[in-house]
Amino acid sequence: MDLIDTHQHLILRDRVGYGWTADIPALATGDFTEADYAGLTAGKGVVGQVFMETGVDDADYQAEARLIAERVGTGGFLGQIASIRPETDAGFDAWLEEAQGLGTVGFRRILHVVPDDVSTTDRFRANLRKIGRAGYPFDLNFLSRQLIPVG
């Protein structure tokens, strides 16, 4: 059976920062490259992958998407889920527009690293609607305690 990996990560320290890895010994140093990924998936039926943004340092999230865009359409890269910051209007529209030309198939914001109320603002919700109107899904990444009980 042919498989598509819809959550591929790479760690490319020479291009972007990964501050969150500092306290995780197995991830604190070194890279996880396309060659590493290919070695792990060889013979496993993986015929393509969608890159999932890797929670890079805030200053690097756009650089990461631009870097991955160079790979989309090659070596099995089918697209990417790019990071976006719907909690701010500064540069939001410009990034949403640019990212559409970077092989982006969706967007994600890691919410468990920001204050819990970030996603409750009118600005956040308005910017999510912009993502939806542009035809893209938004991936929510949060801790269970951040999910408002339903029912």
Go through each PLM region and give its residues.
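An N-terminally biased module of ancient metal coordination in phosphate/nucleic-acid-related enzymes
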Residues: 1-70, 100
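Single-residue recognition of alpha-helix boundary sites
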Residues: 16-18, 75, 150
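Alpha-helical scaffolding within the catalytic cores
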Residues: 29-38, 91-94, 147-150
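A short acidic (Asp/Glu
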Residues: 61, 150-151
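Active-site gating/metal-coordination segments in enzymes
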Residues: 62-146
